[in-house]
């Protein structure tokens, strides 16, 4: 049995994202008093009691939409078409507004199961007969923020979908289990959403020339070469000093959190804007979090053919100079809008994910260590004894982390550590990922 799909629809700031978070198994939507925070349709696994379902949050819709509003309407229309049940939400504090009437007419023409959800009813609620004039036979009064009325909502959902009380059993989920989480990150307007739309061949995410369209992380399940992938679109990251609005601070926090839990991060760079310090700052954050990373230069079709060779040479020089921690990181040049080289990006993600998970046997490690330290010996101490690394072992993967035992670890210089790390990359084919070394002092200083 596949999961039922429930779509939340309503004008801006009626509490759709609050209810989305309330019903979601884990919080996924940014909530803010500013209308219009949600701009893409957003999916999550939801649950009321023992009933599990797929929940879709949609952008708020208004009358007389501008160009952006028309694109938001397309997102909502697609979510309605996918739905088994629609929850049309209105604000109980403000009563029925013209936009509510417009939306009720819009929703009813699809002939879907529908519940009118009157939200923000924390206090004694004087029910307005105007709600009945919207044309729905099922009306539920709730407070999404405080969680009141959810039992009534549950009962209405069960009745509308004719679900029997066998819902305690697990509902089959084709995407259950391990998956490769790929976060697409970068500065605003680099083409992150356009890239994901190109991968899935669907205008799933809102795109346009305006910077900062994406305001929260959007997850999309996808299958590629027998691998379950979760593609995660994120809000663009700007310099801290340029972030002033509280909403953008929330969006930035959401992106940082997505990177923290990613397996692989695609750092998307706008070819027309070239490599900026903020791109390097984002890359360093990804590295510090220990994530695997690939660098994708988008809008390659807009670079003059005569300039491409010089562009690439300068780009590789900047990456190798400023990001030595990920020497050999994959760099791909694509056009997301033309779908040029986009599959190469996913191939690179699969490859670097395997490297990020690499485990090297202790025997091979110490054979390599013995040879490498003989080729380039460690320095002598003042007492005349040589600093030695006696033994090493791999303590974890994701990223590969190693513990090295030395008679005097504080005397091992950063330059010697870089020598070991770079040699390890070449020997074990571990290019493009962070590698971590931890030094431990031997109990016996004379060995």
From Swiss-Prot:
Q: Where does GTP 2 bind?
A: 186-193, 233-237, 298-301
An example GO BP is:
ribosome biogenesis
Where would I find the KH-like domain in this sequence? 358-443
Sorted alphabetically, the keyword list is:
GTP-binding, Nucleotide-binding, Repeat, Ribosome biogenesis
Highest rank taxon of the organism: Bacteria
Q: Which InterPro entries match?
A: G_ENGA, GTP-bd, GTPase_Der, KH_dom-like, KH_dom-like_a/b, P-loop_NTPase, Small_GTP-bd
What region holds the EngA-type G domain? 4-165, 180-357
Q: Which residues bind GTP 1?
A: 10-17, 57-61, 119-122
A Gene Ontology molecular function term for this protein is: GTP binding
Q: Which family does it belong to?
A: Belongs to the TRAFAC class TrmE-Era-EngA-EngB-Septin-like GTPase superfamily. EngA (Der) GTPase family.
Query: How does this polypeptide assemble, per the annotation?
Result: Associates with the 50S ribosomal subunit.
| Functional description taken from the UniProt entry | GTPase that plays an essential role in the late steps of ribosome biogenesis.
Q: What is this protein called?
A: GTPase Der
